């Protein structure tokens, strides 16, 4: 198996005490956030569950500033998500009750990749994002912790793979320091998510 499973992601969430507002793990049919007055987070796969999934992304709703944060470790635009995975974030937002409100929601998303396309670590990066959101809810992307990651132009063949590989090393070190569950399953996580797992460069 490559990547991280639903059960592994749930165990990491619990290990890092990120359960507050966490709705769970979903596939591409995620209905959206339906309670706009509460903090809510979710990890979503761009593929259907019955086919094993494809790529993990994560969403987080901050109700005070009414911001929806969308984090894709590969930094794909909506057009690229549709092209590569037949998955649309815009459609997901429109399905949500957030679209039917007297307040305008602000959508913030990353425009750079932090994960190399040669790795299977999207799920782990989603966990890291939710950790950042837990402590820096209103400005997660600008938080000092998230800014530890190098950003690169999204591409199937990365132009700066060494920077993205540095992110992977940082990610492993971070999770190893913070999560007992990650430490106990360190070898499995590394083997299933390491750089060079997929031949892209």
Swiss-Prot record:
GO BP annotations listed: proteolysis
The keyword Protease is assigned to this record: yes
Induction record: Expressed in the late phase of the viral replicative cycle.
Active site: 55, 72, 122
Catalytic activity: Cleaves proteins of the adenovirus and its host cell at two consensus sites: -Yaa-Xaa-Gly-Gly-|-Xaa- and -Yaa-Xaa-Gly-Xaa-|-Gly- (in which Yaa is Met, Ile or Leu, and Xaa is any amino acid)
Keywords: Autocatalytic cleavage, Disulfide bond, DNA-binding, Host nucleus, Hydrolase, Late protein, Protease, Thiol protease, Virion
Main location: virion
Site annotation Cleavage: residues: 52-53
Disulfide bond keyword on record: yes
GO molecular function list: cysteine-type endopeptidase activity; DNA binding
Activity regulation comment: Requires DNA and protease cofactor for maximal activation. Inside nascent virions, becomes partially activated by binding to the viral DNA, allowing it to cleave the cofactor that binds to the protease and fully activates it. Actin, like the viral protease cofactor, seems to act as a cofactor in the cleavage of cytokeratin 18 and of actin itself.
Note: All late proteins expressed from the major late promoter are produced by alternative splicing and alternative polyadenylation of the same gene giving rise to non-overlapping ORFs. A leader sequence is present in the N-terminus of all these mRNAs and is recognized by the viral shutoff protein to provide expression although conventional translation via ribosome scanning from the cap has been shut off in the host cell.
HAMAP family (alphabetical): ADV_PRO
Role: Cleaves viral precursor proteins (pTP, pIIIa, pVI, pVII, pVIII, and pX) inside newly assembled particles giving rise to mature virions. Protease complexed to its cofactor slides along the viral DNA to specifically locate and cleave the viral precursors. Mature virions have a weakened organization compared to the unmature virions, thereby facilitating subsequent uncoating. Without maturation, the particle lacks infectivity and is unable to uncoat. Late in adenovirus infection, in the cytoplasm, may participate in the cytoskeleton destruction. Cleaves host cell cytoskeletal keratins K7 and K18.
Protein name in the entry: Protease
């Amino acid at each position: 198996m490559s990547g991280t499973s639903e059960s592994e992601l749930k165990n990491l969430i619990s290990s890092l005490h990120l359960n507050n507002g966490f709705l769970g793990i979903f596939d591409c049919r995620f209905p959206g956030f339906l309670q706009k007055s509460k903090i809510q987070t979710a990890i979503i796969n761009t593929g259907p569950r019955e086919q094993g999934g494809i790529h993990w992304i994560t969403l987080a709703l901050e109700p005070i500033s009414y911001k929806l944060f969308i984090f894709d470790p590969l930094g794909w635009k909506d057009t690229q998500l549709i092209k590569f995975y037949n998955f649309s974030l815009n459609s997901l937002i429109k399905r949500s009750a957030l679209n039917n409100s007297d307040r305008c929601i602000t959508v913030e998303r990353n425009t750079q990749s932090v994960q190399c396309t040669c790795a299977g670590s999207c799920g782990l990066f989603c966990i890291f994002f939710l950790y950042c959101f837990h402590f820096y809810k209103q400005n997660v992307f600008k938080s000092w912790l998230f800014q530890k990651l190098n950003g690169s132009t999204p591409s199937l063949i990365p132009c700066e793979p060494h920077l993205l590989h540095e992110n992977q090393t940082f990610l492993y070190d971070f999770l190893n320091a913070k999560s007992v569950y990650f430490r106990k399953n360190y070898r499995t996580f590394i083997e299933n998510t390491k750089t060079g797992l997929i031949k892209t460069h």
